[in-house]
Amino acid sequence: MAERQEEQRGSPPLRAEGKADAEVKLILYHWTHSFSSQKVRLVIAEKALKCEEHDVSLPLSEHNEPWFMRLNSTGEVPVLIHGENIICEATQIIDYLEQTFLDERTPRLMPDKESMYYPRVQHYRELLDSLPMDAYTHGCILHPELTVDSMIPAYATTRIRSQIGNTESELKKLAEENPDLQEAYIAKQKRLKSKLLDHDNVKYLKKILDELEKVLDQVETELQRRNEETPEEGQQPWLCGESFTLADVSLAVTLHRLKFLGFARRNWGNGKRPNLETYYERVLKRKTFNKVLGHVNNILISAVLPTAFRVAKKRAPKVLGTTLVVGLLAGVGYFAFMLFRKRLGSMILAFRPRPNYF
């Protein structure tokens, strides 16, 4: 399996042979708080595809473990496996799903190229996906004064700086212990260090936040056009038309992350960009969105408790079964929570929301 994965990495995905695409199992490695993972999971839900999902816990540094680095040499989630195909980047995964599952029962999220809607959807998808969400994420942690009503615990701000050095030393140690992955670990260490220099620069952060406002102005205008061209008795439109598309996936997940970071009031609160505010409220009520991302902004539910269960499961002897696991949770829960607090900085550093990052 490892040899096959090494061969596939860096090459265009190959079609699985021997079975129809719909019959081959989809396997997704992701992390709940990874921005890129959230987009992929929402696409899977919108297309109603069956998929076996595996959490790669960033608080427990599972994305840095050798088995995962051999699966994806960048050590980033999400990663999709479909038969012989291994796809390691969110945009490529989404395009692969859209191009592979073409039966009539599977909803299409991208219009045909001949459609008048195609250029519009493609434009907004590319525009929204170009936003430096990783910089927003790191920046709001390092400089919380730029945010209002952030949903990230306050202690993360002080923890993150001490975790930066720990993450670098961890990658260095792993590089020494795994000679075959040394190049990959060193490359990841350099990428992390380089990005943090920019993301700790207040002037740079203010610049990209101003640029974000210009993008959201464009989205607000587009939503206003949809409202004006829709009859009163007509179906309420989405960003590019009547259908929920990949542009809506990008916009919905982007707004949800901005809310989490504490940038909602700045960008659509108090009557500012009312179309955007109405759109976000509508997205929150969408069944597929609520299923995938409904509780993701609640760190206790989406990260702390799952981490506690993961720690308890790893430490509980299997011979004693579930009863012991449940009993251990009372004591291990506190331990896991403290572990989570200690490593939350690393987790947030790994929220790579642009196509090449968490």
From Swiss-Prot:
Name the reported effect of residue 120 to G: In CMT2K; dominant form
List the transmembrane segments. Answer: 292-312, 320-340
Q: Where does this one sit in the cell?
A: Mitochondrion outer membrane; Cytoplasm
Q: Which family does it belong to?
A: Belongs to the GST superfamily.
**PROSITE patterns tied to this protein:** GST_CTER, GST_NTER
Q: What is its main location?
A: mitochondrion
Q: Which residues carry this modification: N6-acetyllysine?
A: 203
List the protein's name.
Ganglioside-induced differentiation-associated protein 1
Q: Which organism is it from?
A: Homo sapiens (Human)
Q: How is it modified after translation?
A: Ubiquitinated by PRKN during mitophagy, leading to its degradation and enhancement of mitophagy. Deubiquitinated by USP30.
What does the record say about its membrane topology? Multi-pass membrane protein
The GO cellular component terms are: cytosol; membrane; mitochondrial outer membrane; mitochondrion; nucleus; peroxisomal membrane
Variant or mutagenesis effect after changing residue 156 to G: In CMT2K; dominant form
Q: Describe the protein's quaternary organization and the partners it interacts with.
A: Homodimer.
Q: Which domain of life is it from?
A: Eukaryota
Effect the entry attributes to changing residue 247 to V: In CMT2K; uncertain significance
Q: Which UniProt keywords apply?
A: Acetylation, Charcot-Marie-Tooth disease, Coiled coil, Cytoplasm, Disease variant, Isopeptide bond, Membrane, Mitochondrion, Mitochondrion outer membrane, Neurodegeneration, Neuropathy, Transmembrane, Transmembrane helix, Ubl conjugation
Domain spans labelled GST N-terminal: 24-105
Domain (GST C-terminal): give its ranges: 153-309
Which gene is this protein's source? GDAP1
Record region (Required for mitochondrial localization): 320-358
Report, as the record phrases it, the tissue specificity of this protein. Highly expressed in whole brain and spinal cord. Predominant expression in central tissues of the nervous system not only in neurons but also in Schwann cells.
